[in-house]
Amino acid sequence: MIRYCIVLFLLITINLSSQTTIITGNAQGKPDKLVRVIVYDDLFSGLEKTIASSLTDPFGDFAFKLNIDNSQFAFLALELDKGEFYLTPGSSYRFEISSDSNLNRGSVFDRLPLMFEVFADDGGLQTSIEKFNIEYNDFIYNNVNRIYRTKDNSVVNSFIDYINENYSNDDLAYFDNYVNYTLASLKWLSRIKNNREVLQEYFINKPVLYFNIQYCDFFKEFFKSYFNSEKVFRYEDLIPVLNYSKSIT
């Protein structure tokens, strides 16, 4: 029965509404360099696509105008180096890449992220995610033994209560889902929630959040483990279903 419910929830549709997003920036001391905006074409398989590209002018300036449908995780790339940010429809962004952010010279596998300062007029999504990530990563770093190696869940429950109290934002649906599925992963990994409870609370009869990176990361992590343990079918078999459902919405 659970197997059929899993397939059914994957076919829930989403509504799209395209809006113009403006990106400007400057890469100090880097004229005539390729700048790109990259997003995931498919978060479930990790396929990327470039949605805008341009060369910096003699002063290092660049500008893009994009029509996007959904808030989503993105990369700003300068040549082969790239750094992370979050795109929101109808928003504007200003990037400052300092002159000491030298392009990496080594192997593409050893490259550091592109460092930049971003000024986002996006309703607060970028700063909200940055602030939440700092608190969440600090919590994991300082409590890793208690979270994963003991049965004492009090520290996790207290942290979840704190996050729910301080990071609820009904005006930012992407951020609310980002937080919700980050905490879902924490509950599952700390064994506060078992497989069946996670399925019922976070996936069955819930919309598929194709563009939310935390949802998709947890989806992949959970179902790979779930299918391996339950021997239902392989996670890889779900990707065509997910992509078909996305294509008809």
Q: What role is predicted for each listed range?
A:
Residues 19-171, 188-205:
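A non-transmembrane, solvent-exposed segment enriched in polar/low-complexity residues
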Residues 181-249:
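Charged, long alpha-helical assembly modules
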Residues 1-25:
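Bacterial Sec-dependent N-terminal signal peptides
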Residues 169-174, 209, 213:
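Short solvent-exposed coil/turn linkers within tandem alpha-helical repeat scaffolds
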